[in-house]
Regions:
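Flexible coil segments in periplasmic/lumen-exposed cytochrome c-class electron-transfer proteins
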Residues: 22-25, 32-34, 78-144
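Extracytoplasmic electron-transfer domains, predominantly the class I c-type cytochrome c fold
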Residues: 37, 42-47, 51-101
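A short beta-strand motif characteristic of beta-propeller blades
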Residues: 157-162, 199-204, 241-252, 310-317, ...
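Asp-box/WD-like beta-propeller blade repeats and closely related beta-sheet repeat scaffolds
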Residues: 206-278, 297-314
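Surface-exposed loop and turn segments in beta-propeller and other repeat-based domains
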Residues: 245-254, 287-320, 359-365, 450-454, ...
Length: 518
């Protein structure tokens, strides 16, 4: 844990805790010592999620005790069984299920008051102000010291490095023309950065504990998915002014965290998954989108009934199980998702608006990191697994698993490119976390194992725009970006960086490359 951040959290605790807690009874002191640095001194979240009863609906108290004792796979949550007694662990579990004295909220007025506009030092140019291909830039998120680096993807040289908000989510999003990149932080901040002029433009706090953001394919809107408050927030992509707050609740008023939101460009809509409701939402933003009806109508294609008024109407799709993670097929007609701990994935057709198929997926598939490619004349989807040492390869016509590829250990990411015969994965959640595995996309066999920094975590590969080079991250404070020739698999260059959690190529993201996440 960061000693300075823990000290600041402890200093802030008396002012932030309810009056009854200022005497620091044992459980509050335990929380301050072991939990506040990640989950916030008032349990509102930080690098870790908010720990409040409304955010723990799906977690039984007995399971919470187990998580505190043993940790949680695929997260930074480490177990405390060796540091705390069973009584202390049970006390902490009871504490996080206790409502706070004052219910947390974040209103649209507070959002507007938080907005920051950074004036340019000189007039902005409408063309890149550097000698590099703007479509082959990488945005590298360095979580080690909360910075981002803009990297030239041809020379592999940094063009700029700047401080970011604390605890960025690993997936920044780009405007359709590639000029702007938008960052979302776990504590609710959304930041807009101009890649042409290499400067921060504006920022706004759109929530207290945020999951991720999405940018509409027409470049007009940013949608923010929040764990706290339970909401989606639509922002103007030009100004970052808030346009609408959509409460995440079902028809009976039961609220939910928002697991994730993504842009479905061919549909002109955002798709959001709800953490605590068996629903996904389609939220059209295109003026030509079909009307949205709440309740039953005879035939929505005949425009019968009274449509929900915009902007951002919500079309509710009930599904068979929760979707904690999901992936679009190539046509954006189907969503493939799974609940954490479920033994099967599900396919939801967005046109017929229901679950249509289930898929046998053991362990904990990380479908949000899935990719697709053509295999024997058909398209397959491949997903890593956070719990099992396998890559599941799925036929997207039959929704059957055609092969499970055994890897050195459970992994987090899978990446490829249209111009390479290989897919790359990691073994992040295993003793072999220093190993990258290279898989032939046609034979579905492992062709190489690479250890760019023995003993150190290697993960998250991203390709250059042309697919010639693969960039891997060494996830350590004394980490690096390691550049490989994607054909020979030989190292080309190494750039020292502070825990580079991910790097994102402009071209691959805005063209929705089949080899990267969207």
């Amino acid at each position: 844990m960061d000693t300075l951040r823990l000290t600041l959290a402890l200093l802030a605790l008396p002012a932030l805790l309810p009056a009854a807690a200022r005497g620091a009874p044992p459980v509050e002191a335990l929380y301050a010592q072991h939990c506040a640095v990640c989950h916030g001194p008032t349990r509102l979240g930080g690098t870790g999620p908010a720990l409040l009863p409304e955010n723990l609906q799906r977690l039984r108290r007995s399971a919470a005790i187990d998580v505190i004792a043993k940790g949680r796979i695929a997260t930074q949550m480490q177990g405390f069984a060796g540091k705390l007694s069973s009584e202390e662990i049970r006390a902490l579990a009871g504490y996080v299920y206790t409502p706070p004295a004052v219910a947390p909220s974040w209103t649209i007025a507070e959002m507007r008051a938080s907005r920051v506009v950074h004036p340019p030092a000189r007039p902005d140019s409408d063309r890149p102000t550097f000698d590099a291909d703007p479509m082959n830039l990488f945005v590298v998120v360095e979580t080690g010291d909360h910075h981002a680096t803009i990297l030239d993807g041809d020379r592999f040289e940094p063009l700029a490095r700047f401080k970011t908000r604390y605890a960025l989510h690993g997936g920044p999003k780009f405007s359709p023309d590639g000029r702007y990149v938008y960052f979302g932080s776990r504590d609710g901040w959304v930041s807009k950065y101009d890649l042409y002029n290499l400067r921060m433009v504006s920022e706004i706090r759109a929530g207290i504990n945020t999951r991720n953001i999405a940018v509409s394919s027409d470049g007009r809107f940013v949608m923010v998915a929040n764990y706290l408050p339970h909401s989606l927030v639509a922002l103007d992509a030009v100004t970052l002014e808030p346009l609408k707050v959509i409460e995440a609740a079902d028809a009976h008023g039961k609220s939910s965290r928002v697991s994730a939101v993504y842009d479905a460009a061919p549909r002109g809509s955002f798709i959001a998954a709800l953490k605590d409701l068996k629903e996904i939402w389609e939220i059209p933003y295109s003026a030509s989108a079909e009307p949205v009806y709440r309740g039953l109508v005879h035939d929505y294609r005949n425009k019968e009934g009274i449509a929900e008024k915009g902007p951002f109407p919500v079309r509710v799709i009930e599904v068979d199980d929760y979707l904690d993670d999901f992936f679009f097929d190539e046509a954006y007609a189907n969503v493939v998702g799974a609940a954490r701990g479920a033994k099967r994935g599900q396919v939801v057709n967005l046109n017929v608006r229901r679950s249509i198929e289930s898929i046998d997926l053991p362990g904990l598939p990380h479908l949000g990191s899935g990719i697709t490619w053509q295999w024997h004349g058909r398209q397959v989807l491949a997903t890593p697994n956070l719990k099992e040492p396998i890559i599941s390869v799925i036929d997207t016509k039959t929704w059957k698993v055609v092969k499970e590829i055994r890897t050195p250990g459970p992994g987090f990411f899978l990446r490829s490119h249209e111009n390479t015969p290989y897919a790359w994965t990691d073994s992040f959640n295993s003793p072999r976390h220093d190993t990258l595995t290279v898989i032939d996309k046609q034979s579905l066999e492992i062709v190489a194992e690479l250890r760019p920094a023995p003993g150190k975590i290697a993960a998250h590969v991203e390709f250059t725009a042309d697919g010639r080079y693969a960039l891997a991250s060494i996830w350590e404070m004394d980490g690096a970006i390691v550049v490989y020739d994607a054909t020979s698999l030989k190292e080309v260059k190494r750039l020292p960086m502070k825990k580079p959690s991910g790097k994102y190529n402009v071209h691959n993201k805005i063209t929705r490359s089949e080899g990267t996440s969207h």
